[in-house]
Design a protein with these regions (language model features):
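Canonical positions in the second alpha-helix
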Residues: 24, 57, 90-91, 124-125, ...
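Conserved alpha-helical positions within TPR/SEL1-like repeat arrays
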Residues: 35-43, 66-77, 100-111, 133-145, ...
Length: 297
């Protein structure tokens, strides 16, 4: 995920930002040049080089809390999450109300799977900067992972109010609405996501799953078929089709879809099908038992 701050500073042209430093020092101070280079390099996905520039800035000015946050984001982009948290903590020690550092710390903790702590820090981020749509989005995502769907719906609504083109926010809001069994609202929200990103296979999958919960099995199968057109290597879509066919007591189609599922992902879905109530109507059939109990496809 590319952060709002870095999207803003990526106006620097990379080729200009990494020009010979001594020639540029006449117009800007060395710290400004290095910071600009680091921001541009981050925006270009050159995170290690960005880290080097930010490190040089911090040698010159170890109290620059903004650069400590930039340093933290660069570390997070390199999956060095514990080190990134150290950088965000240094930023916050200097400026405790700096929203971007709270945001970064929460994001890093979420990446490490610490969703409770992540939600705590992301809440601080949106308190200090309520217009940070990415922070609202990341807060909602953490709340989804915690099963706090009512809270996450509110967070995604804030995120969408700031950026109405963020299909990820619509998608995750749809997931949360399913979590509280508001399936009609979920379907409308997923339609908005698909309007913005019609080839997002995972949104079609979620739409299909929602339609199954609504008992609209034919439409669900059509959604999974659309998903497969967008992404062929897509076991979740085949599994969704198997569920919908099973609810219609269509043994042959169920077995065909499960076969395709197990070819693509033989272990996880074989465990899931053993516990999935959608298949209970076919579970005692000998052919079904042979399919789910076969050790290998």
């Amino acid at each position: 995920m590319r952060w709002a701050y870095f999207e803003q500073v990526s106006r620097y042209n990379v080729s200009m930002a990494v020009q010979n430093l001594p020639e540029a020092e006449g117009a800007l101070g060395r710290k400004d040049i290095l910071r600009g280079q680091g921001s541009a390099l981050y925006a270009a996905g050159r995170y290690k080089e960005a880290l080097s520039r930010f490190h040089e800035v911090l040698i010159l000015n170890p109290d620059d809390y903004e650069v400590w946050a930039l340093h933290g984001f660069s570390l997070a982009a390199e999956n060095q999450f514990e080190a990134s948290i150290d950088s965000f903590n240094k930023s916050l020690a200097i400026s405790p109300r700096y929203a971007l550092a709270w945001h970064g710390k929460g994001h890093a903790l979420a990446k490490m799977g610490y969703f409770e702590e992540a939600a705590t820090y992301l809440k601080r981020a949106v308190i200090f900067d309520p217009k940070d749509g990415k922070a609202w989005y990341n807060l909602g995502t953490a709340q989804n992972r915690l099963g706090r769907y009512h809270e996450s719906i509110a967070s995604f609504e804030y995120s969408i109010s700031i950026n109405k083109q963020d299909y990820h926010a619509y998608f995750n809001k749809g997931v949360a609405l399913c979590g509280v069994q508001r399936y009609e609202d979920a379907l409308k929200t997923l339609h908005q996501a698909l309007h913005l990103k019609p080839n997002a296979y995972y949104i079609w999958n979620q739409r299909g799953t929602t339609l199954i919960q609504m008992g609209r099995f034919k439409e669900a199968i059509e959604s999974f078929d659309r998903s497969l057109k967008c992404q062929a290597h897509n076991p979740n879509a085949w599994y969704g089709k198997a569920r919908a066919h099973a609810m219609q007591k269509d043994l042959v189609s169920t077995l065909q879809a499960l076969y395709r599922t197990f070819v693509l992902s033989p272990y996880m879905y074989r465990v899931m099908v053993q516990l999935d109530a959608h298949f209970d109507g076919l579970r005692q059939d000998p052919e079904f038992q042979r399919m789910i109990n076969t050790s290998a496809i």
